[in-house]
């Protein structure tokens, strides 16, 4: 899983930061979380590719959606034929449709808009799911968690070969798939050579929000939490009034949730060139492996929890 930050600014862009957008690539699929103005140019600039199958919108403030019409048009110009799904908070479909129609854009490829509520399983695939959770902003909003299923346990090849005398071959595959096999006159059960299931990865994206219990629950043991941090701690009151979070508050929430890595984004223009200040405020309370203020174009790999 690779996460590329396309836009990390607050409501107003700067020369260094574009409005909100994060692209996640998982096993060849590409998911876009929010699509602020200029997102398609960022995709070109940072070579992420345009083969996005789903756009997950947290809310309909302009800095999170104004890039959608232009991206849809470019996909059309590129002769896209695959369907594209846009997921947005319940009750916002008509606004989203008006935004797209206002540009005169009518994609020739299938475009579907799905409305989601907190608690919905937005996507349910064989190896992962995307779930919506409640956030607290000044308008209808949700966050999203991409949660992978548990993986098979490790296969103990040494035990299979040396202790049980099973030579490498088809029986290994059957055992790893959970099927017992016959060998040397006895039945070998999978659990004899296969360890316990290993957890998949959890990626969580909040969009704009005050700190919430629902976010902490969705981010429990997350491998990467991308949480907004619009303000420094001396503006905590202002953050609450405007439906936002401070860097320290995001770190406190990440601590409670047992998050492994915390990326701070949606940085106000007042902190241009002051990313370290926000990092320092967050790292003073965050006990995970790493907290960082994300930059446009920054890409990080999210390893499996048991990766060495």
Whereabouts are the PLM-identified features?
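Active-site neighborhood of phospho(di)ester-bond hydrolases with catalytic His/Asp-centered motifs
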Residues: 33-36, 52-60, 89, 204-207, ...
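Active-site neighborhood of divalent metal-dependent phosphoester bond hydrolases
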Residues: 80-115, 270
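A short helix->loop->beta-strand "cap" motif at the edges of active sites that frequently abuts
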Residues: 80-84, 257-261, 287-289
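Metal-dependent phosphodiesterase/nuclease catalytic metal-binding core
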Residues: 117-264, 276-280, 284, 306-308
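Conserved beta-strand hairpin/beta-sheet module of binuclear metal-dependent hydrolase folds
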Residues: 1-48, 83, 144-146, 153, ...
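Metal-dependent catalytic neighborhoods of phosphoester/phosphodiester hydrolases
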Residues: 67-75, 99, 272-281
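Short acidic, glycine/proline-enriched helix-loop-strand junctions
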Residues: 272-298
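Active-site metal-binding motif and surrounding structural segment of the metallo-beta-lactamase
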Residues: 37-87, 115
